[in-house]
Amino acid sequence: MRLNDGRSFSCRSDQTVLHAALAAGIDMPYECASGSCGSCRCRLSHGSVSLLWPEAPGLSARDRQKGDRILACQSTPSSDLEINVRAGDALLEPPPRRHAARVTVKETLCASVIRLVLNVGGPIHFLPGQFFILDLPGAGRRAYSVANLENAAGGIELLIKRKIGGAGTAALFDQCAPGMGLVIEGPYGRAYLRADSARGIVAVAGGSGLAPMLSILRGALARGFGGPMDLYFGVNTAEELFCVPELSALQAAGARVHLALRDGGPGPAGLHRQAGLIGDALVAGEPDLKAKDLYVAGPAPMTDDILARTVRQEAIPADRVFFDRFV
């Protein structure tokens, strides 16, 4: 496989172009790695590919009409390929790998969220805030963020919210059980903890977006970060709150935890709560965001609202905002 800048790398017929490029240390652009965002869109100048998800929304109708646009995360090679893409010089994150994993824990946290713990049987490497892709038989590939830190024991903790009508979450909620084997691929993700930054940390999570924010704050604490850390966690109702013991532990370790309950219901004792949208809570609680690093994860409407309020309206530098839009 050859890029327009002359670099080349190997890609198996069962491997996506994105996975192969990253595994080869090539910094190919991407965001969701699951076909929805379009960030890994590139032009196929020679060769042919097979598509894992032919209807992936990351390609627009105009892209499809052109006939030579592909999503690197959804394309496996059927021949030698030449691809036109603007790739960076060197990959800064751990390269993705495929792992055989086994479910060790499945725990219901609230009516719509489960905790799933997988184990790959050996050391697992990822940066705080990254995610893995799960191959789900009959449901395709789904991306889920990790809540814990890399470790020698091979454990991966996922917080998964049921998506109404979603085949992936249906498989995990209704069919998955301890002892079940799964194939996972990763790590992926660019919204990881910038460990070399001395700026304060503001983490914003909507729903299961709490998983990567837990990982980021745990990672900062593990590195001895002594600056200010604030976590804003938004849900619709008090019944949708989860991981309250983990939130309390973060607060005890020095982070400030802010809960935003859209319906204004009561919150758990010991944690600051306010009614309304998480974006309102963020703007009210952070008058000096320009001096901090902002991490955001959650549903696309929430993420887009936060970006509009911060990058566009408040002119916060884009290179200090790291987001994972769940689509």
From Swiss-Prot:
- Cellular compartments annotated: Cytoplasm
- Cofactor binding summary note: Binds 1 2Fe-2S cluster.
The GO terms this record gives for MF are: 2 iron, 2 sulfur cluster binding; ferredoxin-NAD+ reductase activity; metal ion binding
Please provide one cellular component term from the Gene Ontology annotations of this protein.
cytoplasm
**Which keywords has UniProt assigned to this entry?**
2Fe-2S, Cytoplasm, FAD, Flavoprotein, Iron, Iron-sulfur, Metal-binding, NAD, Oxidoreductase, Plasmid
Binding positions ([2Fe-2S] cluster): 32, 37, 40, 73
Record carries keyword Protein transport: no
Give the reactions, separated by semicolons, that this protein catalyses: 2 reduced [2Fe-2S]-[ferredoxin] + NAD(+) + H(+) = 2 oxidized [2Fe-2S]-[ferredoxin] + NADH
Which E.C. number(s) belong to this protein? 1.18.1.3
Q: Which InterPro entries match?
A: 2Fe-2S_ferredoxin-like_sf, 2Fe-2S_ferredoxin-type, 2Fe2S_fd_BS, Beta-grasp_dom_sf, Cbr1-like_FAD-bd_dom, FAD-bd_FR_type, FNR_nucleotide-bd, MRET
Q: Write down the required cofactor(s).
A: FAD; [2Fe-2S] cluster
Q: What class of enzyme is it?
A: oxidoreductase
| Annotated SUPFAM superfamilies | 2Fe-2S ferredoxin-like, Ferredoxin reductase-like, C-terminal NADP-linked domain, Riboflavin synthase domain-like
Q: What is its main location?
A: cytoplasm
- Induction notes from the record: Induced during growth on aliphatic alkenes (such as propylene, ethylene and 1-butylene), epoxides (such as propylene oxide and 1,2-epoxybutane) and chlorinated alkenes and epoxides (such as vinyl chloride, cis- and trans-1,2-dichloroethylene, 1-chloropropylene, 1,3-dichloropropylene, epichlorohydrin, and epifluorohydrin). Repressed during growth on other carbon sources.
The answer to whether the entry has keyword NAD is yes
Domain FAD-binding FR-type, chain residue ranges per copy: 96-194
- Limits of the 2Fe-2S ferredoxin-type domain: 1-89
Q: What does this protein do?
A: Reductase component of the alkene monooxygenase multicomponent enzyme system which catalyzes the O2- and NADH-dependent epoxidation of short chain (C2 to C6) alkenes to their corresponding epoxides. Ferredoxin reductase catalyzes the transfer of electrons from NADH to ferredoxin (XamoC). NADPH is also effective but with a rate approximately 3-fold lower than with NADH.
Listed under subunit, the entry gives: Monomer. The alkene monooxygenase multicomponent enzyme system is composed of an electron transfer component and a monooxygenase component interacting with the effector protein XamoD. The electron transfer component is composed of a ferredoxin reductase (XamoF) and a ferredoxin (XamoC), and the monooxygenase component is formed by a heterohexamer (dimer of heterotrimers) of two alpha subunits (XamoA), two beta subunits (XamoE) and two gamma subunits (XamoB).
Q: Which family does it belong to?
A: Belongs to the bacterial ring-hydroxylating dioxygenase ferredoxin reductase family.
Q: What is this protein called?
A: Alkene monooxygenase system, ferredoxin--NAD(+) reductase component
| The organism of origin for this protein | Xanthobacter autotrophicus (strain ATCC BAA-1158 / Py2)
